[in-house]
Amino acid sequence: MSDFMTEQEFRIEHDTMGEVKVPAKALWQAQTQRAVENFPISGRGLESAQIRAMGLLKAACAQVNKDSGALDAEKADAIIAAGKEIASGKHDAEFPIDVFQTGSGTSSNMNTNEVIASIAKANGVEVHPNDHVNMGQSSNDTFPTATHVAATEAAVNDLIPGLKVLHESLAKKANEWSEVVKSGRTHLMDAVPVTLGQEFGGYARQIQLGIERVEATLPRLGELAIGGTAAGTGINTSADFGGKVVAELINLTDVKELKEAENHFEAQAARDALVEFSGAMRVIAVSLYKIANDIRLMGSGPLTGLGEIRLPDLQPGSSIMPGKVNPVLCETATQVSAQVIGNDAAVAFSGTQGQFELNVFIPVMARNVLESARLLANTSRVFATRLVDGIEPNEAHMKELAESSPSIVTPLNSAIGYEAAAKVAKTALAEGKTIRQTVIDLGLVDGEKLTEEELDKRLDVLAMAHTERENKF
């Protein structure tokens, strides 16, 4: 970058390695610029949620250092104000370092320190990125702390609420369609009747279990490494620093699930809680794929597909075929599922990279975990409000398919036997007749084992779908 900058476009900054040319208007300084030049890899930086968490963390640390007397009030207040500015998203463009950087996140920690120092200077207060902004801290405890703050915030404020919107939408449809009968399908082949409500109740239960899985990770996800400094021992800070910073973070975020790590060596050397959280999101992605794919298949058509439900028309589906409308949100959801599952694979492997006192794959773990949470939260809301809420069932068509399915012969097993029932199914299919007519034609209504009244009762497709047990969703 610096090779192309003119005299007017850059300024000279320095660090312990010497002078560096930095863009004149940039708030970052020397160490950030070195990282920008060292890591021109993907063009993707940190998630905004992580930048926010870094800003809040620096503000919290400054407040604790001010309260203890370690940092004078003027400098501390300048750092706090700058940290909150960063947390607001105002300075996201000042965080240019690629996600594929040093595995501890040191570059991004220093990026935060330098931007805060520059904001403070612009407001008339001189603070040093290391001596003041980073006081009592190390990249090895700040970056994982910010990652867990951001992930916990994402889970509590975005992901869980988004999933609850989807669950409510699916559960509403489950209740609404409790008497809408259709053919069940196993192996993509006709099976005994179910109701559309039962299917959507199953989907709602999947999402509810996903919510519970995420909630179950929070006690570990909310543990913060701050206070461990370089290697977990807390060198260069006080024993109560971590706990006090966490208390400040709770005040700043209103996320009550945050707490100081119970073991600072585990909190810096391992990222198991991120792996666990990512795993919970992977399960949700698998659930979402199944739900979206089922809905897409049920809505296929309009003439040559299943045509059991009508999906909302959201946008034209083809640049060449007039009038075509596609299941775009089903395809969106399934693509998101693929991305989240892929992200989880990277997170799981990255979790293995904790050698001795530090995991050194944290930036990519943070990016993937936060992206997965954002994708699932947004997709859940949109899928619910723009798709599920607008689905209309084709009740007559579904009932017709259910009644024509060979599998409705199943309740006749106890009256005529399995082999005779199988013959009925095959004959009806081969001759294009209903199961009822085939039973009569084969002389199986004998007035003893099976009467015509009993036959009609056993072939009531809605009655077949009803179950005595309660199914929670």
Curated annotation (Swiss-Prot):
**EC number(s) per entry:** 4.2.1.2
Q: Which CDD domains match?
A: Fumarase_classII
Which reaction(s) are listed as its catalytic activity? Answer: (S)-malate = fumarate + H2O
Q: Which Gene Ontology molecular-function terms are recorded?
A: fumarate hydratase activity
Q: What GO terms in the biological process aspect are recorded for it?
A: fumarate metabolic process; tricarboxylic acid cycle
UniProt keyword list: Cytoplasm, Lyase, Tricarboxylic acid cycle
Entry binding sites for substrate: 104-106, 128-131, 138-140, 186, 319, 324-326
Subcellular location per the Swiss-Prot or TrEMBL entry: Cytoplasm
Gene Ontology CC entries for this record:
cytoplasm
Return the annotated site residues (Important for catalytic activity): E331
* PROSITE patterns assigned: FUMARATE_LYASES (PS00163)
Q: Which InterPro entries does the entry link to? A: Fum_hydII, Fumarase/histidase_N, Fumarase_C_C, Fumarate_lyase_CS, Fumarate_lyase_fam, Fumarate_lyase_N, L-Aspartase-like
The organism's place on the tree of life at top rank: Bacteria
Q: In which pathway does it act?
A: Carbohydrate metabolism; tricarboxylic acid cycle; (S)-malate from fumarate: step 1/1
Keyword field contains Cell division? no
Query: Principal localization?
Result: cytoplasm
Quaternary form? Homotetramer.
Reproduce the miscellaneous comment text.
There are 2 substrate-binding sites: the catalytic A site, and the non-catalytic B site that may play a role in the transfer of substrate or product between the active site and the solvent. Alternatively, the B site may bind allosteric effectors.
Q: What is this protein called?
A: Fumarate hydratase class II
Source organism (scientific name): Corynebacterium glutamicum (strain ATCC 13032 / DSM 20300 / JCM 1318 / BCRC 11384 / CCUG 27702 / LMG 3730 / NBRC 12168 / NCIMB 10025 / NRRL B-2784 / 534)
